[in-house]
């Protein structure tokens, strides 16, 4: 099989040396001899011997300034780097270890193993800058990926081999839902998972490491972290490093891969910081002028090829809950399914706090999910939309001013809202309640009966934070009602 991008042979690099002429934070200007200027994206090494700060920095060539000068971005703190320091051109881009042996370990954006220093140095390495698969090798998929979460499976079904995003502002549950998907899908998936921690909290990375060990799926997972305390160069490249590992499993091992990215907004934010440091003219809302290109270069590599797939789940922070912000808006164009987490739903105590009217999926179509699934989903959406339209009237005049038909619809909508909530495995340690999984067929049947009015006599409380019909029957009985 032909791989569409270069593999890195460490022994084949040609090294030339230059010297540092300017250091401004993470931006380092380096002068090379004439005729020996390194190519864009080449990795450079600068050795710092400054007492306790002895280390080797990795710089990436970002611009050619002319007169044998290159402008680079450091992927590590530049403390101790001074003018005149010797810099070596490795002759190749940043590369990361690939292969079956990366599973069960944590790496940084440079491919250094964090849990076992030195591990992986003798593995095959691939450049993180690779071309997407050729058009003729692509294989679009329409197979549904079952999660066991009612609100997702019914209203925004996920595509196996597709790109899925969880949108939301600060504190509405994006990371919890990503961890929930790891728990639900990785356990039952049987393939390989790769997790990219892009600019998020170190604590969350440690929590995930512990959770994966407890769930016994760490042995099938590779983790790559570039946390929020690291330089923007690292945060900008860590997603590419994780994706490169995932591509090896897809292209060389012929496996279906799950790729989790938390958070794709931090990738965009790091690109904006780098763009500013390089002196580029800012675009809309201060973002980099190359935003669409950078997002496209990442997203186009996340795709399905013949017989193999990368299924990507990406958390996307929405600044100030503004969906017109260029960062989330640019991401929308590349997605197969979107799950939007709403502060209004969160305030009602409904978890996961998914806004069913704002979320969408390209496979919610009778030709893919079936006529019954599509019909029930559309009826649920119709009822919830009508309830939303009536809320202003209810707030001003009260529910008693509605027609009998609308009163009945409002009561069903309130039950539907609560029935879309569900206990999650990732939150068990906080709630004390075990997570529940509901098969798609049972979800469709339950909501069909609910829309037809078969549960109108059951109290609203019975629908809150439960699983399927068995849970509903037990809770209804405890409240003095029967299904």
Curated annotation (Swiss-Prot):
Cell compartment(s), UniProt: Cell membrane
PROSITE patterns attached to this UniProt entry: ATPASE_ALPHA_BETA (PS00152)
Highest taxon listed in the record's lineage: Bacteria
Catalytic activity: ATP + H2O + 4 H(+)(in) = ADP + phosphate + 5 H(+)(out)
EC number: 7.1.2.2
Disulfide bonds: none
Pfam families with a match to the protein in the record: ATP-synt_ab, ATP-synt_ab_N, ATP-synt_VA_C
CDD domains in alphabetical order: ATP-synt_F1_beta_C, ATP-synt_F1_beta_N, F1-ATPase_beta_CD
GO cellular component terms, semicolon-separated: plasma membrane; proton-transporting ATP synthase complex
Chain positions recorded as ATP binding sites: 168-175
Class of enzymatic activity (EC top level): translocase
GO molecular function per UniProt: ATP binding; ATP hydrolysis activity; proton-transporting ATP synthase activity, rotational mechanism
Function: Produces ATP from ADP in the presence of a proton gradient across the membrane. The catalytic sites are hosted primarily by the beta subunits.
UniProt record similarity statement: Belongs to the ATPase alpha/beta chains family.
Assembly: F-type ATPases have 2 components, CF(1) - the catalytic core - and CF(0) - the membrane proton channel. CF(1) has five subunits: alpha(3), beta(3), gamma(1), delta(1), epsilon(1). CF(0) has three main subunits: a(1), b(2) and c(9-12). The alpha and beta chains form an alternating ring which encloses part of the gamma chain. CF(1) is attached to CF(0) by a central stalk formed by the gamma and epsilon chains, while a peripheral stalk is formed by the delta and b chains.
Name the UniProt record assigns to this protein: ATP synthase subunit beta
Encoding gene (name): atpD
